[in-house]
């Protein structure tokens, strides 16, 4: 499977903003879109997570904006791994700052000014701007082999392993990278795989009580 199923690096950016969704120009508090300008082409508004976070009363965010996309960096690499990882992080930071300054207005029109992103709207940024402000938010750079995003390339389904096909006793596989029937890098595929893995563990049929159109 590892010889035929391809992967790609990815990046995720999460920012906390003090204004609510209406002030930022969002039509609704929870919106998810994809297919925007690469590499940061996916956006989700996620205020439903704020209840679990503890913020100072004078710096409390009302909006959480999550962005992600592919970070197409070479792998394998001949560089020393710490150097490679640092270079990837630097590229991701540059992509994130450029995105916020020049492209985020499509999603959050109320978070931009004539000169770029309204950095002062970030919760927890302490008046910083640009890369310094970004350092107070969350930037995930997923380039380690175990973190890379598994692609759904035509013709590669046959090389994916099912949850019950590890080849070892007492080892059951689970994850969106397995052959779950959906075979796509998403939460739905991960859930399907997890349900099938659970059925294998307790000795039931792999599709026990699983319904859907994606089953092979």
Short names for language-model regions:
Residues 1-192, 199, 205-206:
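C-terminal segments that line or cap access tunnels to active or ligand-binding sites in enzymes
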């Amino acid at each position: 499977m590892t010889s035929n199923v391809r992967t790609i690096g990815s990046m995720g950016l999460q920012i906390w903003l003090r204004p609510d969704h209406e002030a930022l120009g969002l039509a609704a508090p929870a919106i998810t879109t994809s297919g925007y300008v690469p590499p940061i082409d996916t956006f989700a508004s996620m205020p439903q997570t704020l209840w679990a976070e503890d913020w100072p009363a004078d710096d409390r965010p009302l909006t959480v904006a999550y962005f992600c996309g592919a970070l197409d960096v070479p792998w394998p690499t001949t560089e020393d791994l710490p150097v490679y990882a640092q270079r990837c992080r630097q590229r991701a930071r540059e992509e994130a700052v450029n995105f916020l300054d020049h492209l985020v207005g499509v999603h959050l029109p109320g978070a931009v000014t004539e000169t770029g992103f309204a950095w002062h709207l970030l919760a927890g940024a302490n008046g910083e701007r640009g890369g310094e402000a970004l350092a107070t938010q969350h930037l995930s750079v997923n380039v380690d082999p175990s973190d890379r995003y598994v692609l759904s390339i035509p013709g590669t389904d046959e090389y994916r392993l099912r949850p019950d096909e590890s080849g070892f006793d007492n080892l059951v596989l689970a994850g969106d990278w397995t052959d779950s029937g959906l075979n796509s890098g998403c939460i739905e595929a991960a859930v399907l795989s997890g349900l099938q893995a659970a059925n294998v563990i307790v000795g039931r049929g792999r599709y026990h009580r699983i319904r859907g159109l994606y089953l092979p």
